[in-house]
């Protein structure tokens, strides 16, 4: 009798165990999906540029409160912008191989929950930055609106120059870091914005060349779709040359020293080298290689900026 009861309970026990396993594995997946919506790797890069802006804003070490609250606030706002981008692009994402598996595109997270999540991050970030100063709070909010609304809703679908115009919002973090520490605008901070702004088109156009068919299928007027791949390659090369010139400005204005001049020149020449290969070498892999190099290029460029600043501070 006991044996038969045990056998009879086996399916129930198995079901309970399966349910427990499902619950234990589904929760981490949900949290991973929410994290995915914030584009953590992109946010990390933005925070690095913001941190460099903070450090360059003052001769010595910036105030701990400004650094901590500034990075948290800018991070929350950047994550909110990314999450709003997921919400607004959820239908478009289903048509592209690069984005079809995103949480909202796959229906793993309900739209209203994503909106609440993004709104919460936005409000928290704004309040934290207000604790520092109103200028940083409102500039960061303007950047969020510029990316999540102006770029995602309008520019992305309106013009092949979407990346150029919309790049202003993505180039703001160094300025935001600067104002978080000083509470005021400075021409040197705008130079940092110019660096990221000039870097943005060749970075994204290299990706757009690699994913041209995806963008064409989704009806997004990226430059390779509207003007062709060869024209876009030429523009990538042109912008890398422009970036080399803009990259000299921090040294020419006395903002940075010789360490930066050498480091940035080598990095920018490397970018030009990749752009030349992209333009003249007959290989489909060069677009992706150029895109990957551009990521490390920006990270290294800002590390060189920071290193030069600290070396100069120690010497003088």
From Swiss-Prot:
<comment type="similarity">
    <text>Belongs to the UbiA prenyltransferase family. Protoheme IX farnesyltransferase subfamily.</text>
</comment>
<feature type="compositionally biased region" description="Polar residues">
    <location>
        <begin position="11"/>
        <end position="21"/>
    </location>
</feature>
<feature type="transmembrane region" description="Helical">
    <location>
        <begin position="189"/>
        <end position="209"/>
    </location>
</feature>
<comment type="pathway">
    <text>Porphyrin-containing compound metabolism; heme O biosynthesis; heme O from protoheme: step 1/1.</text>
</comment>
<feature type="transmembrane region" description="Helical">
    <location>
        <begin position="163"/>
        <end position="183"/>
    </location>
</feature>
<dbReference type="InterPro" id="IPR044878">
    <property type="entry name" value="UbiA_sf"/>
</dbReference>
<keyword id="KW-0350">Heme biosynthesis</keyword>
<feature type="transmembrane region" description="Helical">
    <location>
        <begin position="115"/>
        <end position="135"/>
    </location>
</feature>
<dbReference type="InterPro" id="IPR006369">
    <property type="entry name" value="Protohaem_IX_farnesylTrfase"/>
</dbReference>
<feature type="transmembrane region" description="Helical">
    <location>
        <begin position="256"/>
        <end position="276"/>
    </location>
</feature>
<comment type="function">
    <text>Converts heme B (protoheme IX) to heme O by substitution of the vinyl group on carbon 2 of heme B porphyrin ring with a hydroxyethyl farnesyl side group.</text>
</comment>
<dbReference type="InterPro" id="IPR000537">
    <property type="entry name" value="UbiA_prenyltransferase"/>
</dbReference>
<protein>
    <recommendedName>
        <fullName>Protoheme IX farnesyltransferase</fullName>
        <ecNumber>2.5.1.141</ecNumber>
    </recommendedName>
</protein>
<feature type="transmembrane region" description="Helical">
    <location>
        <begin position="67"/>
        <end position="87"/>
    </location>
</feature>
<keyword id="KW-0997">Cell inner membrane</keyword>
<feature type="region of interest" description="Disordered">
    <location>
        <begin position="1"/>
        <end position="21"/>
    </location>
</feature>
<keyword id="KW-0472">Membrane</keyword>
<feature type="transmembrane region" description="Helical">
    <location>
        <begin position="42"/>
        <end position="62"/>
    </location>
</feature>
<keyword id="KW-1003">Cell membrane</keyword>
<feature type="transmembrane region" description="Helical">
    <location>
        <begin position="295"/>
        <end position="315"/>
    </location>
</feature>
<keyword id="KW-1133">Transmembrane helix</keyword>
<dbReference type="GO" id="GO:0005886">
    <property type="term" value="C:plasma membrane"/>
</dbReference>
<dbReference type="GO" id="GO:0048034">
    <property type="term" value="P:heme O biosynthetic process"/>
</dbReference>
<feature type="transmembrane region" description="Helical">
    <location>
        <begin position="136"/>
        <end position="156"/>
    </location>
</feature>
<dbReference type="GO" id="GO:0008495">
    <property type="term" value="F:protoheme IX farnesyltransferase activity"/>
</dbReference>
<dbReference type="Pfam" id="PF01040">
    <property type="entry name" value="UbiA"/>
</dbReference>
<keyword id="KW-0812">Transmembrane</keyword>
<keyword id="KW-0808">Transferase</keyword>
<dbReference type="InterPro" id="IPR030470">
    <property type="entry name" value="UbiA_prenylTrfase_CS"/>
</dbReference>
<feature type="transmembrane region" description="Helical">
    <location>
        <begin position="235"/>
        <end position="255"/>
    </location>
</feature>
